[in-house]
Amino acid sequence: MSIFGSILSLQDAINRFPQFEYQINRLEKEQKDTEAASRASFRKHFVRQCQELHRQLDDHRNRIEKAKTDETYKKENALEQLDKLKQRLTALSPEKEQLSFSVSVDSQSEEEKPKMAAIGRRKSTMYNDDESEDSDNDSEIIETDVQLDDPLPSQPQPPQQQHQQPQPKPRQPITITKPLESKTLNERQELDEVISRLQNPSRGDSGEVMEPVVVRGNVFVAIDSWDAEAEGDLELIKGKKYRITQTRSDGWWTALDEYGQRGLVPKTYLQHVKEKPKNVPSKVSSRLGVRDSVIGISTTTDPSRREANRQASRVDDCLGKAYDNDTHLSLVCHMAPRLSTSNIGFHDLFWSHYKDQVYKRTVHISKIIRLVRFEKMPLIEHKALVRMALVDITNPKSTQIVSNVHTLVPRVKSSTWYFEKKESQTRSCIEFSDFVLRSNYRSPTVVLVVEASHLVKTQIGIEEKSLGHTYLRLIIDDKAVPSRTNVLYLDDEVMTKMKLPEASKRRVLVQVMDVPKDKVSYVDSLPDVIVFNALYLPFFHFYRRRAGTILIRDNRNPLSAEFISDPLLSVFPFVCDQHDIMDIMLKIWKTKKKVLAKKNEAEQTAEFFQTFLHTAFFIHGIRMISYDVKDDLTLSIRQQTMQRFVDALNKGLFKQFIADQQCKPINIIDYSLDLLGNHSID
C-alpha cells in the first residue's frame, strides 16, 4: 500500500466516526425506554445490536492501527476517540459476551432444559427503534410471518364471515433458553440470514414465504371491542382509532390509543384506515409559473408575512387571515404571466401579430360586480372590511380559495354599510364598489364568497374577526349568472344555530352587470381567473400589453433563460394590492385623460409606463412602513411620507429627489423576472 493510499485509508476511517456516534446515540435513546427494557425479547435484541456495534468498532480499530501514515498524532487521536465510543457502548450493554439469556420460570436445571429458541412474541423487524412512533399516516406497515424453524408453506385462510366474531391466534409461551457457547455464532448468522431472506425474498424462495401485505399509513380502527387478557395488553373499543407502532408475525401488534396508552392487541380486531394527508397542496399555489419571481419581492421585504407563511398548520377562520398568511392569494401572483408546460409559451398570454395586440381570451364568467350595501349589520367599534374571492365549495367543510382576495372598506352608518358608486377625487379607490370578476371555471361549485369582517382589540393587538359570509352562484343551469340585483344573506355559526328568519338576517345587495362594450377588449386581455378593482382596468390592460410586447413579440429567443429586466413587469404586480400607491397613480392618470384620448393603444401604454416610473416605481423604493389595510395609523404615516414627494413632483421640484445620504447601487435582479426557473412550470 502506498503512502498516499494509507493516508486515504486513515481519513476514511476517521470519517466513519460520526456514523458510529449516531448509532450509539440511538442505542442510548432506546435504553431510556423502560417498557422495552422490561421485556426479555426486547432486551435480547438490544444486546445483539450492541454486540454487533462492538464488533464493528474492533474491526475499525484494527484498520486504524494497520494504517501507515506520517501523521502519528492523527492516528492517536483517532484511537482515543474510538476508545471513548467503546466505553459508552460498554456502559450501555454490560452483557457483551452474552448472546441470550433465559426468561423461563421453570425450576429445572440448565442441563435438563431443552436447547430451543421458540419466540412467542418477537419484535417486528419492520420498524426500527429510531423511527418516530408519533408519525401519523406517513409510514408503511409490512406484516411478514417470521419462522425460526423450518418454514412451512403458507395455507390460504378462508375469508371471515361478517357474523363470525374475529378471533386472534392463540398465544405462544415465551421460552428462550441459553444455547451452548460453541453454537452461538452460527445461530446468530443463521438467524440474520433468515430475517434477511424474509425481508427481501428472492424469486427462488417465493413459494416458501408468505407475500408481505403492504398498506399506507399506520392508523387502524377497531371493528369490535376486546378486553385485555394479560398484563401489557391494550383494551380495544369498537369504532376507536389506534396507531400501530410495531407488528408481530403471530398477529399481536403494539398499538397506541388517543390517550397515549400502549399495549398489545390482536390484529383480527383491526381494520386499516386510509386517511387524507394533513397538508393538501393548493390547486392555485402549486402552479404559479412566472409569478413566483414576483413573490420574491414580497417575501424578502415583508418579514411579518414571511413568518406567517411558516405557520402552515394554523386554520384561518376568515379571508383576511388567509390573505395575510399566503402571498398566493394576492395580485402579486395572479397578475404576472404563467408559463405553459412546454416552458416556452405562456398559459394565459398570447400575442396577435396581425393586430399587434394581446390576443383576446374569452372565459366563462366575465362580469362587473357592484356591492350596493349591507343592511342590519351589528354595531362595531373599529374598522369594517369586506373581502371577496372565488372559492370551490365541493367540500363544504374545507373550501378551497381559487383566486386572489379582493378587499373593500365600507362607509359605516349605524347598521348599514355603504360603498362609493362613482370615482371620486376625495375618496380612496378601496371604497369603490365595482370590481371586475373573471373566471374560467365551469363547475357550479366555484362561487363568489363575500365576507364581512371587523377589527377587534385583543391581548396581542388588533385582530380581524368575521361577521359572516355569503355565496353568489356564478354558474346557473350551465350558464353564466344573469345581470340582475341579488339579495343575499350573511351567515355564520351562531346565526345558523339560532335559525333566524330571513327578515331578521343581515342582508347583502349585490348587483351583477355586463362589461361595457368599450371595456370588453381590456377585460379580455386579462388573466383567466382574477378579481380586482374596476378602476384599475386600464392599468392592468397596459401591463398585459407590455408583458406581451417584451415576453412574446420582441423576444427573439423563447428558449433563452436570461433574466428579463423590466421595472413594470416586476414591480407593478406588487403595488396592485397597496391602494394608497394606486390612488396616486389614478389621480395623475385622470389629469391625462383628454390627451390620452387622441393616442393609440401603443402610445397609451408608453404613457402609462412613464406614469408608473414617476409614481409607483419611485414610491415603492422609498423606505417607509409596510402596507397594512387594517391599521389606520400605518396608512396615515405612509400617506404623509408619499405626499411630500408627490407635491414635489407636481411642482417640478426635482431637487428634492436627490439623495442626501450614502446610497447603494440598484440591484438589477430585484427588478427582473426569471422566466425559466424550476418554479416557473405551470
From Swiss-Prot:
One Pfam family of this chain: SH3_1
KO phenotype (gene knockout): Impaired male mating behavior.
Composition-biased stretches (Acidic residues): 128-148
Tissue specificity annotation: Expressed in ciliated sensory neurons of the head (amphid neurons) and the tail in hermaphrodites (phasmid neurons) and males (sensory ray neurons).
SMART domains: SH3
One GO BP annotation of this record: determination of adult lifespan
GO cellular component: ciliary basal body; ciliary base; ciliary transition zone; cilium; cytoplasm; non-motile cilium
Region (Disordered): 96-188
Domain SH3: 215-275
PROSITE patterns on file: SH3 (PS50002)
Keyword annotations from UniProtKB, A to Z: Behavior, Cilium biogenesis/degradation, Coiled coil, SH3 domain
Coiled coil, from the record: 10-100
Family: Belongs to the nephrocystin-1 family.
Function description: Plays a role in the extension of dendrites from phasmid ciliated sensory neurons. May be necessary for initial assembly of the cilium.
Protein name: Nephrocystin-1-like protein
The organism of origin for this protein: Caenorhabditis elegans
